[in-house]
Amino acid sequence: AAKYCKLPVRYGPCKKKIPSFYYKWKAKQCLPFDYSGCGGNANRFKTIEECRRTCVG
């Protein structure tokens, strides 16, 4: 798995609500969240499939 899969979810400081997914390391699964459109980190994916491919293996 990529190193950034261990990063905590970061919504960012902006006001948008962009449906996204992040990998929750302790739960070993990809979960949905609303990205704000700016800021955040690399633990953010457009689809659950992309999240699983990158972080689950």
Curated annotation (Swiss-Prot):
Consequence of changing E49A: No change in binding affinity for Kv
Keywords per UniProt: Disulfide bond, Ion channel impairing toxin, Neurotoxin, Potassium channel impairing toxin, Secreted, Toxin, Voltage-gated potassium channel impairing toxin
Consequence of changing K24A: Decrease in binding affinity for Kv
Keyword Secreted belongs to the record: yes
Coiled-coil residue spans: none
Family statement: Belongs to the venom Kunitz-type family.
Result after altering L31A: Slight decrease in binding affinity for Kv
Lineage of the species this protein comes from: Eukaryota, Metazoa, Chordata, Craniata, Vertebrata
Job of this protein: Serine protease inhibitor homolog that blocks voltage-gated potassium channels (Kv).
Name of the protein described by the UniProt record: Kunitz-type serine protease inhibitor homolog delta-dendrotoxin
Impact upon substituting P8A: Important decrease in binding affinity for Kv
Consequence the record notes for mutating Y11A: No change in binding affinity for Kv
Sites annotated Important for binding to potassium channels: K3, Y4, K6, P8, R10, K26
Phenotype when changing D34A: Slight increase in binding affinity for Kv
Subcellular location(s) per record: Secreted
Gene3D superfamilies from the UniProt entry: Pancreatic trypsin inhibitor Kunitz domain (4.10.410.10)
Domain BPTI/Kunitz inhibitor as annotated: residue spans: 5-55
Consequence of changing K15A: Slight decrease in binding affinity for Kv
Consequence of changing T54A: Decrease in binding affinity for Kv
Feature type site, description May be important for binding to potassium channels: L7
Source organism of the structure: Dendroaspis angusticeps (Eastern green mamba)
Disulfide bridge partners, by residue number: C5-C55, C14-C38, C30-C51
CC annotations in GO: extracellular space
Known outcome of mutating P13A: Slight decrease in binding affinity for Kv
